[in-house]
Amino acid sequence: ECDLLIAECLTEGLLDGLDPASLAGLVSCFTYEHRSPTPPDPPWFPSSKARERYREVERLATSLNAAEHRAALPLTRLPEPGFFALAHAWAAGEALDDVLEDEDLSGGDFVRNAKQLIDLLRQVGEVAPDPDTARTARVAAEELFRGVVSASSVVGEVTPR
């Protein structure tokens, strides 16, 4: 749903120059959808650079929505920063208990969101015009694919007899 926005962000360099954990957090804004009936907590960003990048992505999304509206096209979903802190913490190597502490998100929802994020980061790793961004995206995906997230990928596999 955010393909055009992601492509524009890549073209504008909004995903460039970030460390893997911050890139994971920023890219999570394209995949995460707040589903709780309670309002989301205020977003957390690890640095002023990450906060500013999110704001630039948000401005670009708003501009894209305005153009889509004028053209009577379906609107691109706006980015949501509600998973930024969790993605950043998990990519930085924090324990699952610490990541989910004080969060209104089940372990299963965390894993589902992490897997969607890993998939998108791998795609960014393939298409990012900046080689450093492509490499950082691949590293971020690798850093997210651990613990319960990687274990959930082998559950249900059948061993041939």
Tell where the protein language model's regions lie, with residue ranges.
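Non-catalytic terminal extensions of ATP-dependent helicases
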Residues: 1-161
